[in-house]
């Protein structure tokens, strides 16, 4: 017997075992209690309710657009209106790591460290990269991209595959158009989303009056 960590990994296993009998794309909404071995603190609970929406079997960016629109619609229904959607792509982040000269096999470790930026700041990220023995030239090159906060979706195309930028811009434009500008979406190059199973588009929602993300 064990306590369920989240809803996403069991869904992946279910889909892998039953994909031939399921509709494609497979759309799921589920809600249940999940458990984490967390040190209890503000925003970190050992037991909480997870509401999950997933689209499996559709590799187009249309799935990402639908997920953002559905998420924000749900937030509107529970009374949250003053929020913004932050968006990035893990492939862009991987290309940034490569641009700095880091080895591909270190990407996950790098992502875990970089994901702490909101808590420890860019100087803290630099210090932790140094503590973990990463090459100083690579560290300096990486930190320089984020030091002044001026890395935009347009400028990041200079250090990553331009197709990733095009796809991300399409998502932003589509959400903006469908919502008639009611859903603010902004590119956030420092957005990581800690789980290792993220490989493409990632997003999270920040709302006024709440610390951390309220959805993602």
What are these regions (language model features)?
Residues 72, 94-98, 111, 126:
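Amphipathic alpha-helical segments within well-ordered protein domains
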Residues 1, 102-125, 129, 207-210:
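Acidic, His- and aromatic-enriched active-site or binding-groove loops in soluble protein domains
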């Amino acid at each position: 017997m064990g306590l369920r960590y989240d809803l996403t990994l069991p869904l992946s296993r279910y889909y892998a075992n039953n994909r031939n009998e399921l509709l494609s794309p497979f759309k799921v909404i589920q809600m249940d209690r999940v458990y984490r071995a967390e040190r209890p603190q503000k925003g970190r609970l050992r037991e909480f309710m997870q509401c999950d929406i997933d689209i499996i079997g559709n590799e187009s960016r249309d799935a990402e657009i639908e997920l953002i629109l559905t998420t924000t619609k749900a937030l509107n229904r529970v009374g949250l209106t003053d929020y913004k959607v932050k968006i990035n792509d893990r492939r862009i982040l991987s290309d940034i790591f490569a641009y700095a000269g880091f080895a591909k096999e270190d990407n996950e470790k790098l992502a875990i460290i970089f994901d702490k930026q909101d808590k420890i700041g860019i100087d803290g990220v630099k210090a932790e990269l140094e503590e973990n023995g990463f090459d100083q030239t690579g560290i300096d090159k990486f930190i320089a991209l984020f030091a002044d906060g001026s890395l935009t979706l347009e400028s990041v195309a200079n250090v990553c595959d331009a197709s990733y930028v095009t796809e991300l811009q399409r998502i932003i434009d589509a959400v903006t158009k469908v919502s008639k500008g009611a859903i603010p979406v902004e590119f956030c190059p420092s957005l990581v989303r800690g789980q290792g199973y993220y490989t493409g588009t990632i997003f999270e929602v920040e709302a006024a009056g709440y610390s951390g993300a309220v959805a993602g």
